[in-house]
Amino acid sequence: MKKSISVLRKESQIKNFISTIITNELTNANIYNPTVTDVVLSTDLGHVKVFLAFSSKENDGLDAVKNASGYIRKRLSKTLNWRKVPELHFYIDEVEKKAFEIDQILNSLKNEE
């Protein structure tokens, strides 16, 4: 199903704000070089899936961000001016790993020929 322009705009806003909050305001040592790769907003605007990539210590970084989700949601409520701020769900983005694995498989097939 195609997303409406307003949902895409809201996803973009959330992505920018969460990225700024995580990189500039969270001071946990386990959060090392985080990148918000994607944000998916549910159709009822009640839940947000936030996909993150870390340069190292992915699980520790994800746990630290999950622990700070209340703070992040509070900061979003102050900046978004929405009637209801969505609940945040954080996940590690596996796309880069999958792409690297596929690239290795293709290179090994190329070398076999």
Swiss-Prot record:
Organism: Mycoplasmopsis agalactiae (strain NCTC 10123 / CIP 59.7 / PG2)
GO molecular function, one term: ribosomal small subunit binding
InterPro entries xrefs: KH_dom-like_a/b (IPR015946), RbfA (IPR000238), RbfA_dom_sf (IPR023799), Ribosome-bd_factorA_CS (IPR020053)
Protein name: Ribosome-binding factor A
Any one GO biological process: maturation of SSU-rRNA
Family matches, as SUPFAM superfamilies: Ribosome-binding factor A, RbfA
Chain's role: One of several proteins that assist in the late maturation steps of the functional core of the 30S ribosomal subunit. Associates with free 30S ribosomal subunits (but not with 30S subunits that are part of 70S ribosomes or polysomes). Required for efficient processing of 16S rRNA. May interact with the 5'-terminal helix region of 16S rRNA.
One Pfam family per UniProt: RBFA
Predominant localisation class: cytoplasm
Cellular localization per UniProt: Cytoplasm
